């Protein structure tokens, strides 16, 4: 995976700094929610924002605009990156796909199994099986960058590559398992929007306004269809042309223009809106409930075990190789960091249980504690026990 290092060097630095900003926004949300401004914080998130065109009306709380709208842009960027890597990047070589794919697969299966084992027999709680399968890449990358120069750049790229498959897994989980009542009419409109983008792509049309209009129609129709609106983001990305008829980079230009807004606006706002756990309402007894224990074990134990085990098996049976210049100890350290589920786990938690206080916020606290433990232990392990050989 050598040639991808230089290509993503700037992205690594930006996402690392963005990760620090996420930490600040998380702490700020906790302080505001548990301080004298808690009422204003909740009013801000519940503020109704919307528009109407004729009989059509879309009116939702600001929190849902963030979780359904802004986060769709994040998945759109993931889709652009995925397409770029498969067509012209390292993923064009199937051998480079195996390690991050297997790592992501292990990081989904093992945490989900642990959560299910702890909560077997409780149908409602089992709805949250996907909560510990997620990784907050920006946070994990920020911690990895803090570990210093003795961590090979190839491991940073491995984490980014793993994140792509992890996010695709999250999209599939959301689309398949967390949907509500489906609307055929909305699906038809979504199909028309997709067909329009396909035609634009085939004709080589690279007017951004055309794709923007189609993507908005697709987003609204997917939102109304019952499938989570984030799916619209990655679908749109697949139809963005790689270049213009003159050979100028089109997809790359769009991707580069989004990076700043993702790192410094969208993801920090998402963290601020979702990390405000009301600690005063938490029932201490609920912390040791099945949902909390399942989330903690899934994130802190399941993620590192699953990612490392599946990675090791791929390497052991020669389907893949260790990232250049790294050793198994360092690889394991990165696997620990994948237990930082934070914003993505909170997001899936909201989809799974809808009523956020059903467990007296113990589920949210478990996500924060498990993510904190994964970050601290991962940093200590990489910094002091996994030095470069």
From Swiss-Prot:
Q: According to its UniProt record, where is this protein located?
A: Cell inner membrane
Q: Name one GO cellular component term.
A: plasma membrane
Highest taxon of source: Bacteria
Membrane-protein topology: Multi-pass membrane protein
Q: Function of this protein?
A: Na(+)/H(+) antiporter that extrudes sodium in exchange for external protons.
Q: Which UniProt keywords apply?
A: Antiport, Cell inner membrane, Cell membrane, Ion transport, Membrane, Sodium, Sodium transport, Transmembrane, Transmembrane helix, Transport
Catalyzed reaction equations:
Na(+)(in) + 2 H(+)(out) = Na(+)(out) + 2 H(+)(in)
Q: Which organism is it from?
A: Campylobacter jejuni subsp. jejuni serotype O:6 (strain 81116 / NCTC 11828)
InterPro entries xref list: Na/H_antiporter_dom_sf, NhaA
Q: What is this protein called?
A: Na(+)/H(+) antiporter NhaA 1
Cross-referenced Pfam families, in alphabetical order? Na_H_antiport_1
**What's a GO biological-process term for it?**
regulation of pH
Q: Lineage of the source organism?
A: Bacteria, Pseudomonadati, Campylobacterota, Epsilonproteobacteria, Campylobacterales
Please give the Gene Ontology molecular function terms for this protein.
sodium:proton antiporter activity
Similarity comment: Belongs to the NhaA Na(+)/H(+) (TC 2.A.33) antiporter family.
Asked if the Swiss-Prot or TrEMBL record annotates the protein with the keyword Transmembrane, the reply is yes
Tell me the gene name. nhaA1
Report the transmembrane regions from the record: 12-32, 62-82, 97-117, 128-148, 157-177, 184-204, 220-240, 260-280, 282-302, 331-351, 365-385
């Amino acid at each position: 995976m050598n040639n991808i290092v230089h290509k993503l060097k700037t992205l690594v630095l930006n996402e690392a700094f963005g990760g620090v900003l996420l930490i600040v926004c998380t702490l700020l949300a906790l302080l505001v929610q548990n301080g004298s401004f808690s009422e204003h914080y909740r009013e801000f998130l519940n503020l109704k924002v919307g528009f109407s065109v004729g009989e059509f009306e879309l009116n939702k709380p600001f929190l849902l605009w963030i979780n359904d709208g802004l986060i769709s842009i994040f998945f759109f960027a993931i889709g652009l990156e995925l397409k770029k890597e498969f067509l012209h990047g390292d993923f064009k070589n199937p051998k480079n796909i195996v390690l991050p794919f297997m790592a992501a697969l292990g990081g989904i299966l093992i945490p989900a199994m642990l959560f299910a084992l702890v909560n077997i027999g409780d149908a409602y709680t089992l709805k949250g099986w996907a909560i510990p399968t997620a990784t907050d890449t920006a946070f994990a990358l920020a911690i990895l960058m803090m570990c210093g120069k003795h961590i090979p750049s190839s491991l940073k790229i491995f984490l980014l590559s793993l994140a792509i498959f992890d996010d695709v897994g999250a999209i599939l989980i959301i689309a398949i398992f967390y949907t509500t009542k489906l609307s055929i009419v909305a699906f038809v409109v979504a199909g028309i929007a997709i067909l329009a983008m396909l035609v634009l792509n085939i004709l080589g049309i690279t007017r951004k306004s055309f794709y923007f209009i189609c993507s908005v129609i697709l987003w609204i129709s997917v939102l109304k269809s019952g499938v989570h609106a984030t799916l619209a983001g990655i679908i749109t990305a697949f139809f963005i042309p790689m270049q213009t008829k003159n050979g100028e980079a089109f997809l790359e230009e769009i991707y580069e223009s989004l990076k700043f807004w993702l790192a410094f606006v969208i993801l920090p706002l998402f963290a601020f809106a979702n990390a405000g756990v009301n600690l005063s309402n938490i029932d201490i007894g609920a912390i040791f409930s099945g949902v909390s224990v399942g989330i903690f074990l899934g994130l802190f134990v399941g993620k590192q075990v699953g990612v490392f085990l599946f990675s090791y098996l791929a390497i052991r049976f020669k389907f893949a190789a260790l990232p250049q210049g790294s050793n198994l100890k360092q690889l394991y350290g990165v696997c620990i960091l994948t237990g930082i589920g934070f914003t993505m786990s909170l997001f899936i938690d909201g989809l799974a249980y809808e009523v956020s206080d059903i467990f007296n916020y113990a589920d949210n606290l478990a996500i924060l504690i498990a993510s904190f433990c994964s970050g601290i232990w991962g940093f200590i392990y990489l910094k002091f026990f996994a030095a470069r050989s």
